[in-house]
């Protein structure tokens, strides 16, 4: 391998002016190589690069359009959901208000019904007490009357003789006669 390298270097150093030879100046060689590669890339790679960039651009544009459509659809769905939520919240609030008012009404009805029942029970209690009191009074009157009659009968039986009995009958008959 050393022999080949020495041979190429010797050819380059011995080449006469105006002929084709090996350039040993690295800076110039590198610039020439870069210019050749760039020229080839521009000439042959221009179409490929344009197609690649156009395809990439189209994909990006399509992705953006799809994203915009999805975003618009999501915004519409969100607006519909928010409107539905607002409607449902209003209905729930209305039901709550209606429910509370119905509960309050039922509570008032129950209180009124209980109050009326208590009044009826109180009235019946008073009537029952009055009836029992009247019955007790009547029982006491009857007992007192019976006791009084028994005492009167005892007194009369003890003090009544046949003369007094005849005298009482005559007085009563005469009173009846004056009444006619």
From Swiss-Prot:
Give the protein family. Belongs to the ATPase B chain family.
Q: Which organism is it from?
A: Cuscuta gronovii (Common dodder)
Just give the chief location class: plastid
Q: Which InterPro entries match?
A: ATP_synth_b/b'su_bac/chlpt
Give membrane topology per the record.
Answer: Single-pass membrane protein
Q: Indicate yes or no for the key word Transcription regulation.
A: no
* Protein localization: Plastid membrane
Q: Which UniProt keywords apply?
A: ATP synthesis, ATP-binding, CF(0), Hydrogen ion transport, Ion transport, Membrane, Nucleotide-binding, Plastid, Transmembrane, Transmembrane helix, Transport
GO BP: proton motive force-driven ATP synthesis
For molecular function, the Gene Ontology terms on record are: ATP binding; proton transmembrane transporter activity
Give a short account of what the protein does.
F(1)F(0) ATP synthase produces ATP from ADP in the presence of a proton or sodium gradient. F-type ATPases consist of two structural domains, F(1) containing the extramembraneous catalytic core and F(0) containing the membrane proton channel, linked together by a central stalk and a peripheral stalk. During catalysis, ATP synthesis in the catalytic domain of F(1) is coupled via a rotary mechanism of the central stalk subunits to proton translocation. Component of the F(0) channel, it forms part of the peripheral stalk, linking F(1) to F(0).
Quaternary organization: F-type ATPases have 2 components, F(1) - the catalytic core - and F(0) - the membrane proton channel. F(1) has five subunits: alpha(3), beta(3), gamma(1), delta(1), epsilon(1). F(0) has four main subunits: a(1), b(1), b'(1) and c(10-14). The alpha and beta chains form an alternating ring which encloses part of the gamma chain. F(1) is attached to F(0) by a central stalk formed by the gamma and epsilon chains, while a peripheral stalk is formed by the delta, b and b' chains.
Please give the name of this protein.
ATP synthase subunit b, plastid
| Gene Ontology cellular component list | plastid membrane; proton-transporting ATP synthase complex
Listed transmembrane segments: 27-49
């Amino acid at each position: 391998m050393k022999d080949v390298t020495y041979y190429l270097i010797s050819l380059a150093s011995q080449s006469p002016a105006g002929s084709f030879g090996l350039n040993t100046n690295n800076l110039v060689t590198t610039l020439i190589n870069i210019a050749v590669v760039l020229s080839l890339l521009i000439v042959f790679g221009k179409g490929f690069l344009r197609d690649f960039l156009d395809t990439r651009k189209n994909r990006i544009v399509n992705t953006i359009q799809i994203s915009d459509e999805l975003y618009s659809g999501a915004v519409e769905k969100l607006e519909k959901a928010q409107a539905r939520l607002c409607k449902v919240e209003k209905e729930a609030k209305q039901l709550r208000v209606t429910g509370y008012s119905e509960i309050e009404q039922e509570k008032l009805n129950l209180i009124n019904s209980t109050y009326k029942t208590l009044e009826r029970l109180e009235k019946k209690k008073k009537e029952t007490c009055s009836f029992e009191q009247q019955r007790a009074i009547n029982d006491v009157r009857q007992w007192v009357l019976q006791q009084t009659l028994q005492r009167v009968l005892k007194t009369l039986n003890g003090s009544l003789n046949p003369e007094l009995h005849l005298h009482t009958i005559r007085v009563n008959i005469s009173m009846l006669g004056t009444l006619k």
